[in-house]
C-alpha cells in the first residue's frame, strides 16, 4: 500500500439495532479523519435505516454503503425479517444467526470489487464469525466489535481462562470472580455469556469464541476514564490491541442527529420535545428495557402499576408486537392510559433515546443494562435504575452500581430465558418498582451522591471525544496501527 493511499475500513454489523447503531457511529467517527474511507456492508432493509439516520449528517456522502440480500426464507424465517429485533420468537435466534452468517459469499464478492481503495481492515461484529475468515483471505487485520464494556470483556476473559464455571455446581450460589481489580460476586448464569455451551447454540457460540480469539484487535465503545483498571487489564490480555473510542453516541451532537439515530421513531421530535419541555428539571423517569426485552406480560403490568404508584412523571417505551400488543390492549382496557395521561408518556415502538436522555427534565433511567443504553445514560449524566435481563447485562449492572456507584439495583437476580419467560412470571412487584423509583428520584444523601457521581462521569465522557481526549487519541492510534499493518503488506 502506498503511503498516500487512503485507509479503507470495511464495517460489517450484525443485524440488530443494539449492534448496528454503535457501528454506524464508529463509521462516522472514522470517516471524519483525513485519509480514511469507510464502507458499511449490510442488508436491504438495514441499508434504508442507515441512510435515513445519516441523511441529516454532513458525513452522509463520505460513507459508502453496500447492499447484500438477506436470505431469510432459505433459513425458515419470514420474508423481510432482517433484524433480530423483528423476530416473533427468540426461539428463532439460531435461524437468524445462520441466515446472517450465510451472507459470507455476498460480502466476499463485494469486497473483491473494492479496488480503489482496496480494503485495509475489517471491523466485524462478534456475531458474524465469517468476518475472521474474510480477513485472512484478504490478508488484512480484523477488529472485533462486541458492543460490551471493558469490565464485561475482562470478566468474560477471566471466566473463560480460569475455568471457574466447572467448579460451581449451583446456579444460585454467588462466588467471587478471580483476578479482577475489584471484588465482585456473581452467580453462574450471570457470567455464562460467550462461554462454551450445550444445546442449540453450541455450534454458533463455538464459532463466535474462535473468531474472537482470531481477531487482530478489539474496538470498544467506552472511554478509558470510565473503567480505567479494566481498560488497562483488558488491553494487557489482548496484547495491547484494544482501542476505547467511545462514547460513540457523542458523534450525534445536533438535536436532529440524536432524533434520527437508529430506527424510525414512533413519536415526532416536536411532540416529544413539547412533552419534555412541560416537565420540571430532573423530574422525569425514562423507562426503556431494550429492543429485545422479553419480560412476561404479568411482569410488564406490575412495572406499569409500579410506575403509576410512584406518582413520578415518566416516559415508558414498549415494543409493538406480540405480548406488547397485549400490553397495549391492557393499558387501554384497564384504564391505565387514562389514569396516567397527565404525567406519563407511553411510546409504542422505537424512541429517540439519546435525544430524550439529553433533555434537562430527565432525572432517572430505568434500564435493562444493555451496554449502549448504560453508556448513553451515563454520558447524559442520568442516574440508572438497573433491571438486567440476559447476556452480559448483569456484568454491566455490577459495574454501574458497585464500582461506579452511578446506579441503583431494582433487585433482579435471575436471567430471563427465552421461551421460558411465562414460567418465570413476575419477579418484581409493583411495590418494589414504586420503592426503587422513589429512592432513585428522591433527595436522600445516597440519591444526591449518585447524581454527583454520574454528573462527574458525564463530564469525563464528553471530554473523551474532544480534540486530544482519550477516545479521540485512541482513534488516531488505531488509524496509525492499521496504516502500519497496511504498509507492511507490501
Swiss-Prot record:
It comes from the Eukaryota. Its EC number is 2.4.1.-. It holds the Pfam family UDPGT. This is UDP-glycosyltransferase 73C7. Belongs to the UDP-glycosyltransferase family. GO terms for biological process: phenylpropanoid metabolic process; positive regulation of innate immune response; response to other organism. Transmembrane segments: none annotated. InterPro entries: UDP_glucos_trans, UDP_glycos_trans_CS. It is an enzyme of class 2 (transferase). UDP-alpha-D-glucose binds at residues 291, 351-353, 368-376, 390-393. One of its GO terms (molecular function) is UDP-glucosyltransferase activity. Keywords: Glycosyltransferase, Transferase.
Amino acid at each position: 500500500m502506498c503511503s498516500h493511499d487512503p485507509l479503507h475500513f470495511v464495517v460489517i454489523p450484525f443485524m440488530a439495532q443494539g449492534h448496528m447503531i454503535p457501528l454506524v457511529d464508529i463509521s462516522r467517527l472514522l470517516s471524519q479523519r483525513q485519509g480514511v474511507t469507510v464502507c458499511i456492508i449490510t442488508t436491504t432493509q438495514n441499508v434504508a435505516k442507515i441512510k435515513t439516520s445519516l441523511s441529516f449528517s454532513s458525513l452522509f456522502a463520505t460513507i459508502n454503503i453496500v447492499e447484500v440480500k438477506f436470505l431469510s426464507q432459505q433459513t425458515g424465517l419470514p420474508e423481510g425479517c432482517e433484524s433480530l429485533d423483528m423476530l416473533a420468537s427468540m426461539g428463532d435466534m439460531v435461524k437468524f444467526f445462520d441466515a446472517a452468517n450465510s451472507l459470507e459469499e455476498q460480502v466476499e464478492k463485494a469486497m473483491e470489487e473494492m479496488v480503489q481503495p482496496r480494503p485495509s481492515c475489517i471491523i466485524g461484529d462478534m456475531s458474524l464469525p465469517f468476518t475472521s475468515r474474510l480477513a485472512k483471505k484478504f490478508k488484512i487485520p480484523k477488529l472485533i466489535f462486541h458492543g460490551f464494556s471493558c469490565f464485561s470483556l475482562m470478566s468474560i476473559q477471566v471466566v473463560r481462562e480460569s475455568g471457574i464455571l466447572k467448579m460451581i455446581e449451583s446456579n444460585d450460589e454467588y462466588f467471587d470472580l478471580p483476578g479482577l481489580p475489584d471484588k465482585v460476586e456473581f452467580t453462574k448464569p450471570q457470567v455464562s455469556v460467550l462461554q462454551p455451551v450445550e444445546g442449540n447454540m453450541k455450534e454458533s457460540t463455538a464459532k463466535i469464541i474462535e473468531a474472537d480469539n482470531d481477531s487482530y484487535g478489539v474496538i470498544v465503545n467506552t472511554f478509558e476514564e470510565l473503567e480505567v483498571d479494566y481498560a488497562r487489564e483488558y488491553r494487557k490480555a489482548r496484547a495491547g490491541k484494544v482501542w476505547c473510542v467511545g462514547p460513540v453516541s457523542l458523534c450525534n451532537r445536533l438535536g436532529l442527529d440524536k432524533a434520527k439515530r437508529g430506527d424510525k421513531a414512533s413519536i415526532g421530535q416536536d411532540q416529544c420535545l413539547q412533552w419534555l419541555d412541560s416537565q420540571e428539571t430532573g423530574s422525569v423517569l425514562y423507562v426503556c428495557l431494550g429492543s429485545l426485552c422479553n419480560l412476561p406480560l404479568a411482569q410488564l403490568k406490575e412495572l406499569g402499576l409500579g410506575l403509576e404508584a410512584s406518582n413520578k412523571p415518566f416516559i415508558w417505551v414498549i415494543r409493538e408486537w406480540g405480548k406488547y400488543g397485549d400490553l397495549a390492549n391492557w393499558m387501554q382496557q384497564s384504564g391505565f392510559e387514562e389514569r396516567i395521561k397527565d404525567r406519563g408518556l407511553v411510546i409504542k415502538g422505537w424512541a429517540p433515546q439519546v435525544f430524550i436522555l439529553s433533555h434537562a427534565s430527565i432525572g432517572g433511567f430505568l434500564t435493562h443494562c444493555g451496554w449502549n443504553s448504560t453508556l448513553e445514560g451515563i454520558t447524559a449524566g442520568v442516574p440508572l435504575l438497573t433491571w438486567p435481563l440476559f447476556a452480559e447485562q448483569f456484568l454491566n449492572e455490577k459495574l454501574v452500581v458497585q464500582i461506579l456507584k452511578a446506579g441503583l439495583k431494582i433487585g433482579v437476580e435471575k436471567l430471563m430465558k427465552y421461551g421460558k419467560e411465562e414460567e418465570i412470571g413476575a419477579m418484581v412487584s409493583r411495590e418494589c418498582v414504586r420503592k426503587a423509583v422513589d429512592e432513585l428520584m428522591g433527595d436522600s444523601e445516597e440519591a444526591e451522591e449518585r447524581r454527583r457521581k454520574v454528573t462527574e462521569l458525564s463530564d469525563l465522557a464528553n471530554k473523551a471525544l474532544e480534540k486530544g481526549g482519550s477516545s479521540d487519541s485512541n482513534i488516531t492510534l488505531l488509524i496509525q496501527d492499521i496504516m502500519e499493518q497496511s504498509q507492511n503488506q507490501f
